[in-house]
Amino acid sequence: MNSKKERTRELILNKSYELFAKNGFKQITMKDVCEATGLSRGGLYSHFAGTDQIFETILEVINQKDEMNFEKEMNEGMSAIDILESALHLMEDEMLHPEDSLSLAMYEYAVAIDRDLMNDFNQIGEKKWTDLICYGIKRGEFNEVDVHEIVSVILYVYQGVRMWSRIVDMTDVTFRAITNHIRKQLIKESMRDDS
């Protein structure tokens, strides 16, 4: 069972995530976090020194999530197509819920506080996707693509749609078109469900 300190920290991160997703990074203060969590200022400050530290911790937790960490599945010999399908399903689900996106907050954080941290997270994402695509090519499941090119498309189109969908109505048809394009670029035609 988690200690009271761990549960309080988790409460802070969960409530802060909701605040950042709804309002961006710049508008959120420690007072807002206190109100959302019901903690006193002293209680909150005993866990985090400021909103930037809370936001950085949220990003680290997200980055460590197993859903987009392909290394375990690759080490277990899982099909590259199955790993890709799982990732694309998660991406579609996230695109369908722009209200849960931290894209605006990430942009504001990078401009106001630390662009280098965003670059670090981006490099981690590039490596994860590069490793998966190389794995799929090696296994003969993926086409021989320009890996850097397709990784750039995956990362930047996805993040662009997440940001854009905050201000423009988009449909699931658009989101499926994006993930279907990625499938068609990567998965060998003879191995696709639609062939």
Question: What are the residue ranges of the model-derived segments?
Answer:
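Basic, helix-initiating cap at the start of DNA-binding domains
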Residues: 1-23, 27-39, 53
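Amphipathic, non-transmembrane alpha-helical scaffold segments
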Residues: 5, 13, 59, 63, ...
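Base-recognition residues in the alpha-helical recognition helix of bacterial helix-turn-helix
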Residues: 21, 35, 45-49, 57, ...
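Key DNA-contact positions within bacterial/archaeal DNA-binding proteins
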Residues: 42
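Hydrophobic alpha-helical connector segments
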Residues: 57, 61, 71-98, 150-154, ...
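Amphipathic alpha-helical packing segments from all-alpha helical-bundle domains
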Residues: 67, 96, 114-139, 152
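Amphipathic alpha-helical segments used for helix-helix packing
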Residues: 95-114
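Hydrophobic/aromatic-rich alpha-helical bundle segments in the mid-to-C-terminal region
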Residues: 119, 123, 138-183, 193-195
